[in-house]
């Protein structure tokens, strides 16, 4: 009964909501290649692509059911929301990608983590890096059986563990990506309000979101890559500025200000914030698959996480030792000189604006690959018209997605609490619990007792961090909301 209702709803939406009637061309055109998969110049459009590449989805009115092999190919086409590279990448390039993911915008909040958690926060920065490195290794091991690659994505690993479990992984990935977009809005608004307090935070969020509506039209990974490149440049500039500024006050530092005192109410939020900053597992399978020499993956991942841990510890300590009790949620807001603060904050705002398109694009691709490739492969019709342009309703849905991130940001405009809550939910699942759980299930027959205990230990630790973190982070968020209302 429920399946019939879903089928009726699906048919109705395909006919009336995601309708081809918006197109003015002849809808009887068959075998039109999709927007994302045009053949290269000189290639024959009749030759099918290899089975492990994303296949064109044909716009067709033919009503016959697809063959089982075709459905399997469509399943293989779905990835983690990140497009494949046009050519294999080196270990150094892979390390750069991982470093960008875990050394991102949110390091500006590390000094406040040291202020709140002291040496416990510093220990978390090192410990979480260690665990995330090992769970990344475990996740990649789940792709192989007897040295042969059997699976390609995080979702395929989850579905092998339990059919249908991959949907939970996709939901966590989507939550992680959209949460990242939301936090960029909160961060940009915080920085702008500190520079120009005549406009409140909500106003700056709306202004920032208006400029980000153009992301709704992004459909070229090359453009997203260029934006990410400029984002990396701005990241290096602002980090260099802040490190040099902090080093100029080295004579005033006092390491005794970093305490061992433990506040059980705030520490789980800080740990979640640290976990959120190390989450890169959603694209590790794709990254490993695109390396020229996948055997170098473990070494690459190890040194990437070592570098990240060292930099995060140093940056967090430098910021707190320089500003002490005056340390703000964003380190640049701690700067005493207003003109200098405006300069640094504006660079950070540009970085936030350049950072938003990548997770947004990945979220859009995730939704497209699982909902909008075309019926019957996915529940709804394709986002693209036969002339390879994006349909009007698809653009509208993307605009709604941008507005959704704005709505959530307006509802919970609290940077540290939001990062902590997201890290304790999706971060612990994607980076702690699931990789160890899947590895224990898939490799159980080949693991020795120590390796089994190691996986079980990570699962127990991840569950403990998740449960306690969600509770205390939620309490911290509620306190922040109540404090703002009073």
UniProtKB/Swiss-Prot annotation:
Glycan attachment residues as annotated in the record: 337
Matching InterPro entries: AA_transpt_TM
Name of the protein this chain belongs to: Vesicular GABA transporter
Keyword Glycoprotein: yes
Domain of life: Eukaryota
This protein's GO CC annotations: dendrite terminus; neuron projection terminus; synaptic vesicle; synaptic vesicle membrane
Keyword flag Transcription regulation: no
Region of interest (Disordered), residue spans: 29-85
Function: Involved in the uptake of GABA into the synaptic vesicles.
Segments of skewed composition (Basic and acidic residues): 66-85
Compositional bias of kind Polar residues: 29-46
Lumenal, vesicle side stretches: 115-119, 189-203, 250-263, 327-341, 420-421, 479-486
GO molecular function: glycine transmembrane transporter activity
Signal peptide: none
Stretches that traverse the bilayer: 94-114, 120-140, 168-188, 204-224, 229-249, 264-284, 306-326, 342-362, 399-419, 422-442, 458-478
Keyword annotations: Cytoplasmic vesicle, Glycoprotein, Membrane, Neurotransmitter transport, Transmembrane, Transmembrane helix, Transport
Topology, Cytoplasmic side: 1-93, 141-167, 225-228, 285-305, 363-398, 443-457
Predominant cellular place of this UniProt entry's protein: membrane
Location in or out of the cell: Cytoplasmic vesicle membrane
Topology with respect to the bilayer: Multi-pass membrane protein
Upper classification of the organism: Eukaryota, Metazoa, Ecdysozoa, Nematoda, Chromadorea
Assigned protein family: Belongs to the amino acid/polyamine transporter 2 family.
GO biological process: gamma-aminobutyric acid transport; glycine transport; neurotransmitter loading into synaptic vesicle
Organism, as annotated: Caenorhabditis elegans
